[in-house]
Amino acid sequence: MDNYQTKNISNLLTSLCFTTLLILAPVVICTRQHRFDSPKRSLLANEQDLVTGLPGQPDVSFRHYAGYVPVDESNGRAMFYWFFEAMDLPKEKPLVLWLNGGPGCSSVGYGATQEIGPFLVDTNGNGLNFNPYAWNKEANMLFLESPVGVGFSYSNTSSDYQKLGDDFTARDAYTFLCNWFEKFPEHKENTFYIAGESYAGKYVPELAEVVYDNNNNNKKNGSSFHINLKGILLGNPETSDAEDWRGWVDYAWSHAVISDETHRIITRTCNFSSDNTWSNDECNEAVAEVLKQYHEIDIYSIYTSVCIGDSARSSYFDSAQFKTNSRISSKRMPPRLMGGYDPCLDDYARVFYNRADVQKSLHASDGVNLKNWSICNMEIFNNWTGSNPSVLPIYEKLIAGGLRIWVYSGDTDGRVPVLATRYSLNALELPIKTAWRPWYHEKQVSGWLQEYEGLTFATFRGAGHAVPCFKPSSSLAFFSAFLSGVPPPPSR
């Protein structure tokens, strides 16, 4: 999900879209970063990051590591990761980097402990439960809190936080990978994938492009450094602002969240392909009406009861971003909506990760000088300084480069709904390889799937924004299919 607040609506929401220049993939040269104060940890000493004695952790046979990797020595910038080895054959199985969106939301708080990690946060943040559908059954899983300012990731230079945007985030994530592989050289040759959901629909292809370009440049320049990137996996992803907005509105109307009249006004007054759309007061008011209706339900899972009193939900709907704000950007930008699923588990995660014993065990702090961990950083969200309006050109580039791209969508998500994703993918005009069909898991229809030349798209029937929260078993099966490159079964 910039530093843009537009009249009325831009402060009522904040969101899917911005309209800045399409970033070119930056070329980043991997150089070894030396340690700096806090944390004082050698890049090669991964054993110092081995997690032992995590409070409430179930007994497991695999190893996991957590800690900081520096990405800018001079500015004192470091990123926090949590890495889970595959449950068996970790040296042979793929390595998958998982990113959550926001921008400003934690992949540790969401992906690792609410969705696909082996330890799910317990009720009231008292401990952890083993996840029988953890994705490290199939791969080594690396969770990164990105960019700095998210979760435990930090910078000692305050001006860094004013630069946060897509380009900055992709560069830092690539530098993180370079330095992380110095810590874990045994995984340098593993096949590598990047996965994520929501606003990571921007992060993932942008980072993949940086990796892809640097691999090619390193090869031309005779460098031996190479990240073995094979593909990307995207869940309910923000993709192309114009199509995402249109799909967001059409989904709300087709699922009876908004009235015919509201839909008609938006259709008539909102040109989501135009930079000037948000200067239209009638459009702003109609879009605000959509948000008003979504305020009453869970936008991330429209048929799920809301968590009354949930802090993340309250901060989203009731904070300053949802009220008028006197700051008007000189360049009108579209509003943004916070990404990430917000059930009561958000509060439990906040309690758990602010415990002194947990932070010490994860090497996030010394257990005395505690970090103030939050699942989403609203300052990052409100001050994002550059978002790619569409990553579809990156899709085209990666497809041409032979990388695997799979996209999935939970069909009860109102935040980045299935219609938005279908509109975005249709804009690519890819040839259809296999026609629309159901796909099955445990003899039941899990969703529908269509294969294009270079891309596979699937839906999850009855799943919300964070698909693995709703369909853990079928999402694990789908993940396994993605890694194999073979679509899930077309019959019972």
From Swiss-Prot:
<feature type="disulfide bond">
    <location>
        <begin position="270"/>
        <end position="283"/>
    </location>
</feature>
<feature type="disulfide bond">
    <location>
        <begin position="105"/>
        <end position="376"/>
    </location>
</feature>
<feature type="active site">
    <location>
        <position position="198"/>
    </location>
</feature>
<comment type="similarity">
    <text>Belongs to the peptidase S10 family.</text>
</comment>
<dbReference type="GO" id="GO:0004185">
    <property type="term" value="F:serine-type carboxypeptidase activity"/>
</dbReference>
<feature type="glycosylation site" description="N-linked (GlcNAc...) asparagine">
    <location>
        <position position="221"/>
    </location>
</feature>
<feature type="glycosylation site" description="N-linked (GlcNAc...) asparagine">
    <location>
        <position position="383"/>
    </location>
</feature>
<feature type="active site">
    <location>
        <position position="465"/>
    </location>
</feature>
<feature type="glycosylation site" description="N-linked (GlcNAc...) asparagine">
    <location>
        <position position="271"/>
    </location>
</feature>
<feature type="glycosylation site" description="N-linked (GlcNAc...) asparagine">
    <location>
        <position position="156"/>
    </location>
</feature>
<protein>
    <recommendedName>
        <fullName>Serine carboxypeptidase-like 31</fullName>
        <ecNumber>3.4.16.-</ecNumber>
    </recommendedName>
</protein>
<keyword id="KW-0732">Signal</keyword>
<keyword id="KW-0645">Protease</keyword>
<dbReference type="GO" id="GO:0005576">
    <property type="term" value="C:extracellular region"/>
</dbReference>
<comment type="function">
    <text>Probable carboxypeptidase.</text>
</comment>
<dbReference type="InterPro" id="IPR018202">
    <property type="entry name" value="Ser_caboxypep_ser_AS"/>
</dbReference>
<feature type="signal peptide">
    <location>
        <begin position="1"/>
        <end position="30"/>
    </location>
</feature>
<keyword id="KW-0964">Secreted</keyword>
<dbReference type="InterPro" id="IPR001563">
    <property type="entry name" value="Peptidase_S10"/>
</dbReference>
<feature type="active site">
    <location>
        <position position="413"/>
    </location>
</feature>
<dbReference type="GO" id="GO:0006508">
    <property type="term" value="P:proteolysis"/>
</dbReference>
<keyword id="KW-0378">Hydrolase</keyword>
<dbReference type="Pfam" id="PF00450">
    <property type="entry name" value="Peptidase_S10"/>
</dbReference>
<dbReference type="InterPro" id="IPR029058">
    <property type="entry name" value="AB_hydrolase_fold"/>
</dbReference>
<feature type="disulfide bond">
    <location>
        <begin position="307"/>
        <end position="344"/>
    </location>
</feature>
<keyword id="KW-0121">Carboxypeptidase</keyword>
<keyword id="KW-1015">Disulfide bond</keyword>
<feature type="glycosylation site" description="N-linked (GlcNAc...) asparagine">
    <location>
        <position position="372"/>
    </location>
</feature>
<keyword id="KW-0325">Glycoprotein</keyword>
